[in-house]
From Swiss-Prot:
It is an enzyme of class 1 (oxidoreductase). Catalyzes the NADPH-dependent reduction of 7-cyano-7-deazaguanine (preQ0) to 7-aminomethyl-7-deazaguanine (preQ1). The gene is queF. The lineage of its organism: Bacteria, Pseudomonadati, Pseudomonadota, Gammaproteobacteria, Pasteurellales. Its main location: cytoplasm. Its EC number is 1.7.1.13. GO terms for cellular component: cytosol. GO terms for biological process: queuosine biosynthetic process; tRNA modification. The active site is at 187 (thioimide intermediate), 194 (proton donor). This is NADPH-dependent 7-cyano-7-deazaguanine reductase. Pathway: tRNA modification; tRNA-queuosine biosynthesis. Belongs to the GTP cyclohydrolase I family. QueF type 2 subfamily. It comes from Haemophilus influenzae (strain ATCC 51907 / DSM 11121 / KW20 / Rd).
Length: 279
């Protein structure tokens, strides 16, 4: 997918950068959601009514007022209705800028991050900063559903093709949760691989799992950000399968101390953040 937009030309992705020695909110860089939504025809009216980009930030550190380093892990929920998503490398550089800066306590850091991220995204952002004790007991979790990956099929094309979903439903009405660990796309700017687990929960006509798997695999050489891929999958399923209810949720592997987990639904509440085996 080729995008031509001035907002992408200024991004730090793919460029040599220096790490800031002191806290700097100006390091954050926005990417307009309209960049992808215009092409999908959903800039004004999205088919999903609930959603967030759920980030886990593992590399957070700052100094307390006595100069002693502090560490934490953050859960960050960026509302789908925000004007912008946040470019991941700029997010990493921003978080690194806290390393040698003094803050009074956890709450001061959390409030600072929430303010800065909300301003960059031009929308609602929730930040929960967790001390290490919270994550010491966190288990490796999984997304519930039937895995569609173990099918004995031959794949010869890895170019994105939404037409794999054409005529993908039967007349049987079901409620299903389907999982694939084979979602792989590429960064829009750097072409680096993005590896994810895809979760689909729907109510409606039964979706043919072979067609769905071929569609998922077709993302393998596709270039878009994580958030854009999930919105594309949601729109394609609504167009071809026309379910009564739909949730699309992807959890991507960690890069640069961050994992990004976009969630879009027209009927389910936002999930609690969790951690999969590959995260």
């Amino acid at each position: 997918m080729n995008y031509q937009d001035n907002s992408l030309k200024s991004l730090k992705l793919g460029q040599k950068t220096e790490y800031a020695s002191q806290y700097d909110r100006t390091l954050l860089q926005p990417v307009p959601r309209a960049l992808n939504r215009d092409g999908l025809g959903i800039t004004q009216n999205q088919p999903f009514t609930i959603g967030a980009d759920i980030w886990t930030a593992y590399e957070i550190s700052w100094l307390n007022e006595k100069g002693l380093p502090q560490v934490a892990i953050a859960d960050i929920y960026l509302d789908y209705q925000s004007q912008n998503l946040i470019e991941s490398k700029s997010f990493k550089l921003y978080l690194n800028s806290f390393n040698q800066s003094k803050f009074a306590d956890f709450n001061a850091v959390q409030q600072t991050m929430q303010r800065d991220l909300s301003e960059c995204a031009q929308g609602d952002v929730k930040v929960r900063l967790n001390p290490m004790a919270v994550y010491d007991s966190q288990k490796i979790d999984h997304l519930q559903g039937d895995c569609i990956d173990e099918q004995d099929i031959e794949i010869t094309s890895y170019e994105f093709n939404a037409n794999w979903l054409k005529d993908c439903v039967s007349d049987e009405i079901v409620e299903e949760k389907l999982v694939s660990h084979l979602l792989k796309s590429n960064c829009l700017i750097t072409n680096q691989p993005d590896w994810g687990t895809l979760h689909i929960h729907y109510v409606g006509k039964k979706i043919n799992q072979e067609k769905l798997l071929r569609y998922v695999v077709s993302f393998r050489q596709h270039n878009e950000f994580h958030e854009q891929c999930v919105e594309r999958i949601f729109c394609d399923l609504m167009h071809y399968a026309k379910p009564e209810k739909l949730t699309v949720y992807a959890r991507y592997t960690r890069r640069g101390g961050l994992d990004i987990n976009p969630f879009r639904s027209n009927f389910e509440n936002l999930p609690e953040n969790l951690r999969l085996a590959r995260q």
